Amino acid sequence: MEYHQPEDPAPGKAGTAEAVIPENHEVLAGPDEHPQDTDARDADGEAREREPADQALLPSQCGDNLESPLPEASSAPPGPTLGTLPEVETIRACSMPQELPQSPRTRQPEPDFYCVKWIPWKGEQTPIITQSTNGPCPLLAIMNILFLQWKVKLPPQKEVITSDELMAHLGNCLLSIKPQEKSEGLQLNFQQNVDDAMTVLPKLATGLDVNVRFTGVSDFEYTPECSVFDLLGIPLYHGWLVDPQSPEAVRAVGKLSYNQLVERIITCKHSSDTNLVTEGLIAEQFLETTAAQLTYHGLCELTAAAKEGELSVFFRNNHFSTMTKHKSHLYLLVTDQGFLQEEQVVWESLHNVDGDSCFCDSDFHLSHSLGKGPGAEGGSGSPETQLQVDQDYLIALSLQQQQPRGPLGLTDLELAQQLQQEEYQQQQAAQPVRMRTRVLSLQGRGATSGRPAGERRQRPKHESDCILL
């Protein structure tokens, strides 16, 4: 014991010195006669290597705590382990703030750059911006319209553009707009709309909050995001409409927006009133059957509402696309970066709800160099055959609109849609009856439901007896 008492304090001090600064322990191991000088040198070494004073205090506190258990313990391993733990924690605490400011630097170049595709548009080389996966489709859809309208121009050799440059061009367009009316009230309202649009600009790079209404192709719940489209004079359309020939769906959906309809479905399904439960189920079925967010009635209304040669933004499946109308047909601008080198792929036809479309070039001629299906024709065909295919395609589309109308003034397509809708209505009408019968059967299981169940059980008994014989 006498041998351990004079040596235990020295390892304890050595443990604290090693836990903080291992290099100072070798220098300070020589002078054992002046422990105060060694403590002062330890403090100086700690202050030089570690600037924060709190980190120099943490090991000293651990050293003070080690002095009390030393007479009880015969060895000093617990001392260095307790002395090293605060050091590890302080090192991690110092290293974490150093990594945080580096993360924004690494994230900056990732979503900023977008490839520019040059297309011949009405006799002039015009740029359009392509997007990769999860790109800022609202910003690109608006900017592509401004490029196609030649309100924003880029240098001829521009191949890559950043989102900051796009935002700057869009901001300049908004600030250059002047109110048409000179009255003070309208000017104040116009200035307020400009301020709202400028505050919304950063959201265009991430996504817009758009809430559709199912009553019209241009019916949206007004939000500050819509002020950007209003100021630029860009129409915003959608095709998610309720068919007026389905009165039950019209009654269940009404004039509600999408968010309001979802809330109503939840409240109706938890209601004790069977009529409200039925309306909630009908509204829920409407959302499920129209999950593509485009109906045939909406497509017809969209074709009628869009003007010839008009450039607009089409919203579907939480995606914004640049849309135009050419010769009574709707086309969507192809902005997928995978078609960057495909000069003949510029527009995509929108004539079907199921997504069956065709690619066209900048002059709305059917593209033969690339197709969506495996049986698409290649570019090796002669010009005569390509021209014949173009004519056949245009004739097929024109016949779709020039079909002879029946006694009710409906085309074959509309008649087929009406028959499909009538069948859908019959299914909807049968569902409430089935639901009510189920509710009644659940309520009156005691007496009425026993007889048919007993009869159904007797039949398999006879069949089983016959099988056994």
UniProtKB/Swiss-Prot annotation:
Keywords recorded for this protein, A-Z: Hydrolase, Phosphoprotein, Protease, Thiol protease, Ubl conjugation pathway
Keyword Cell inner membrane (UniProt): no
Effect of mutating residue 423 to A: Loss of binding to 'Lys-48' tetraubiquitin chains
Effect of residue 422 to A: No effect on binding to 'Lys-48' tetraubiquitin chains
CC annotations in GO: nuclear body; nucleoplasm
Impact upon substituting residue 414 to A: No effect on binding to 'Lys-48' tetraubiquitin chains
Signal peptide, first to last residue: none
Extent of Low complexity compositional bias: 66-76
Site feature: Ubiquitin-binding: 412, 415-416, 419
Name of this protein: Ubiquitin carboxyl-terminal hydrolase MINDY-1
Phylogenetic placement of the source organism: Eukaryota, Metazoa, Chordata, Craniata, Vertebrata
